[in-house]
Amino acid sequence: NAKGTTDQKVADLYVSGMDTVTIEKLGYGPIKPLLAQINAVKNYQELINLAADEYKEGNGFLFGFGVGPDDKISTKNVVNLSQTGLGLPNRDYYFNTDAATQKIRKEYLKYITKLFTLTGTDQTTADKQANAILDLETAIAKSHSTPTELRDPIKNYNKFAVADFQKQIPDIDLKNVFDRMLVKTDTLLVGQPTYYQALNSLLKTR
């Protein structure tokens, strides 16, 4: 493939993913700079800034951000915010008590713990941090709409002026977030406002 072409870039990406020898040799080295950034966060405002900055790198957390056609005016694109923040598929995985779901939660906890140990964290600390993450995700899940509720197009269409929605989440500076994302808008669709209201509170208390 000619250098610089789309075909060449796709081929390089595929080969890099198949090069397991190099992957094992590098370990978690490629993400060390990002982990250092995360470890340097001192307060929730710095966390918000990091989340906004990382969207430009394709790493999304805290904000379920996107741009797409307005459901009621399909000729216009609009900024969308939706619920996010869970490692499991939806809120049911955090609250259902059947045996299968309980097993999934148990294995998920093991998975999180393993990720910590792979980055050099000792087992005791890894266990503690993994439990803290699952606890936080469970708190976030409480604010999420159910899969059934997500299928309701009316319930999930909530258009706001940015200034008006800002009043509902006073500790999340939307102008700062959008400026850091290089986004300019005065209107947005918020699929699940309760998530962002809960996030506004959780950021200050967790």
Predicted regions and their residues:
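Noncatalytic, helix-rich "gating/capping" subdomain that lines the substrate-entry/channel surface
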Residues: K3-R206
